[in-house]
């Protein structure tokens, strides 16, 4: 599932959206169109409905799923190839019900189970934006590359009836703090955070769509494009337990804080979506996430162990697999103490991505590198190089295991050279137990918008959805 797997507008940027030229007609309600542009930001619609180097919302993004390849659709108001002839009822039916204009069910790469709780008011604004604020693009949709019989759509209708709730405007429980209620709506509705951060069941459905659905909600997802979305619950080891509300606010606004930095698929979310949220909405999300208890049993607390830093500083690394590689390739940025450099190179000591059960993200970023994208609030891009060509599979496995067990990190399992080879050569994720397996969920391939490489060159982001 996609999601991009995806949750401030400044006054100047409020009416802008991702590379679109506003095409308002005289009868369009300007305020409603502007509100719809913001709702589209909340849902990060542009991330999935725009192909790499393609025109905004014209579709064509390749999405790898367990049953084959599908392509996002053209949702510009073009009357022939887009949604220009959709009535509001038909638009609402597609977004919140998962049913397209011809009556067939959409592939659940479209997160309509989350969108089902969006308010009718937000839906009307979103419709106004797509009809009057988006430039029409006459680009036909690409047909899915799925073999028969998996290409038949009628089973999707059964899936929808089993796992997608009937659309209903979000209503908070009586007595809920209004700020938490707003955060709940943003996270579980348009933001569809659970599409990536919630584990999936036997039919690839999210195991819980909100906190009422149980402790699986936002407890960490399956690999998507070989990035594992971590837990957003308040576990102090693998979740947000050591994060403050202000940490969450700043992370979503800029993509970086003193003890963490965005990478992988979340880089797209910050670049195209959350950096444009209002401050009030970002604070609401932060307050809501901090209200979620850890999944029992909690893994306790993280305690830093200085013995690794002392060993590295002494130079006695030859007898410790991975330590010598760490000193030569990693310590210059992430330091001997595993503390990194604030707002540039994230710490490895106690990092939830490092100690989480599934090591796929760590293996992937070491093998292929990653990008910390620029934002309006932190306009410098930083990239980590990939080591798949300069280090052997065994060297990568050793340094991964070293990082996961140093500075007080107590990550489970052991990564092998075979795991690294499989991920590097075929794209298969690493399982939690240290052996190769197929991802349980949607495997989505969405390239980083800012490319790759090793760069500290200052960049600016103008609020338009195009790398500057």
From Swiss-Prot:
Its EC number is 1.1.5.5. It catalyses: ethanol + a ubiquinone = a ubiquinol + acetaldehyde. Binds 3 heme c groups covalently per subunit. Its cofactor is heme c. Its main location: membrane. The alcohol dehydrogenase multicomponent enzyme system is composed of a dehydrogenase subunit I (AdhA) and a cytochrome c subunit II (AdhB). This is Alcohol dehydrogenase (quinone), cytochrome c subunit. It comes from Gluconacetobacter polyoxogenes (Acetobacter polyoxogenes).
């Amino acid at each position: 599932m996609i999601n991009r797997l995806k949750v401030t507008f400044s006054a100047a940027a409020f009416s802008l959206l991702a590379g679109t030229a506003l095409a308002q007609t005289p009868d369009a309600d300007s305020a409603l169109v502007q509100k719809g542009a913001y709702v589209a930001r909340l849902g990060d619609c542009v991330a999935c409905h725009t192909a790499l180097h393609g025109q905004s919302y014209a579709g064509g993004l390749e999405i790898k799923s367990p049953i084959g390849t599908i392509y996002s659709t053209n949702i510009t108001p073009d009357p022939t190839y887009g949604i220009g002839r959709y009535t509001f009822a038909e638009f609402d039916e597609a977004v919140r019900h998962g049913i397209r204009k011809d009556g067939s069910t959409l592939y659940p790469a479209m997160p309509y189970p989350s969108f089902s709780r969006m308010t009718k008011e937000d839906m009307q604004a979103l419709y106004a934006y797509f009809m009057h604020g988006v430039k029409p693009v006459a680009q036909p949709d690409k047909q899915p590359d799925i073999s028969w019989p998996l290409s038949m759509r009628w089973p999707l209708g059964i899936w929808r009836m089993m796992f997608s709730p009937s659309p209903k405007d979000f209503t908070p429980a009586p007595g809920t703090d209004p700020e938490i209620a707003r955060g709940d709506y943003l996270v579980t509705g348009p933001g569809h955070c659970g599409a990536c951060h919630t584990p999936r069941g036997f039919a690839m459905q999210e195991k819980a769509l909100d906190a009422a659905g149980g402790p699986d909600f936002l407890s960490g997802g399956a690999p998507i494009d070989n990035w594992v979305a971590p837990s957003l619950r308040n576990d102090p080891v693998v979740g947000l337990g050591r994060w403050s509300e202000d940490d969450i606010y700043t992370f979503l606004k800029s993509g970086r804080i003193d003890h963490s930095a965005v990478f992988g698929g979340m880089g797209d979310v910050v670049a195209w979506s959350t950096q444009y949220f209002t401050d009030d909405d970002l604070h609401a999300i932060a307050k809501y996430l901090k209200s979620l208890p850890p999944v029992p049993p909690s893994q306790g607390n993280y305690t830093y162990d200085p013995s690794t830093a002392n060993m590295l500083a002494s130079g006695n690394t030859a007898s410790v697999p991975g330590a010598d590689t760490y000193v030569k390739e990693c310590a210059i940025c992430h330091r001997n103490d595993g503390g990194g450099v604030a707002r540039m190179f994230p710490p490895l000591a106690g990092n939830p991505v490092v100690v989480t059960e599934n090591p796929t993200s760590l293996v992937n970023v070491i093998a292929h590198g990653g990008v910390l994208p620029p934002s309006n609030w932190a306009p410098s891009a930083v990239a980590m190089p990939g080591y798949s060509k300069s280090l052997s599979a065994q060297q990568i496995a050793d340094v991964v295991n070293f990082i996961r067990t140093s500075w007080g990190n107590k990550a489970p399992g052991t990564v092998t050279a075979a795991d690294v080879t499989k991920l590097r050569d075929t794209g298969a994720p690493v399982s939690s137990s240290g052996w190769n397996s197929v991802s349980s969920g949607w495997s989505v391939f969405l390239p980083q918008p800012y490319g790759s490489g090793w760069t500290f060159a200052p960049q600016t982001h103008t609020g338009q959805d195009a790398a500057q």
